Amino acid sequence: DWECLPLHSSCDNDCVCCKNHHCHCPYSNVSKLEKWLPEWAKIPDALKRCSCQRNDKDGKINTCDKYKN
């Protein structure tokens, strides 16, 4: 049975991260920002990467249905 990705792994949704982590995309607003940037100011893909981060008390938690039971 497939387990879950460890902390700091690349992810595209909460379900691939472990239950006590969530998939965090620090630059999820980058696409909006890029519209306003000059053509040469490209933001590297590495910065746009989402990764599994620890759940925290600010409500950043894993919302995947498979963990809800």
Curated annotation (Swiss-Prot):
Species this protein is from? Oxyopes lineatus (Lynx spider)
The protein in question is named Omega-oxotoxin-Ol1a
So what does this one do?
Weak blocker of vertebrate P/Q-, N- and L-type voltage-gated calcium channels (Cav1 and Cav2). Is both paralytic and lethal when injected into lepidopteran larvae. Is not toxic to mice.
The organism that produces this protein has a lineage beginning with: Eukaryota, Metazoa, Ecdysozoa, Arthropoda, Chelicerata
One annotated GO molecular function = toxin activity
Q: Which family does it belong to?
A: Belongs to the spiderine family. Spiderine subfamily.
Provide one Gene Ontology cellular component: extracellular region
Q: Which residues form the Oxytoxin-type inhibitor cystine knot (ICK) domain?
A: 1-68
- Principal localization? secreted
What the entry lists under InterPro entries is as follows: OXYTX_ICK
Recite the other comments.
Answer: The primary structure of the mature peptide is identical to that of omega-oxotoxin-Ot1a from Oxyopes takobius (AC P83288).
Q: List where in the cell it is found.
A: Secreted
Q: Domain comment text?
A: The presence of a 'disulfide through disulfide knot' structurally defines this protein as a knottin.
Q: Which domain of life is it from?
A: Eukaryota
Which tissues is this chain's protein expressed in? Expressed by the venom gland.
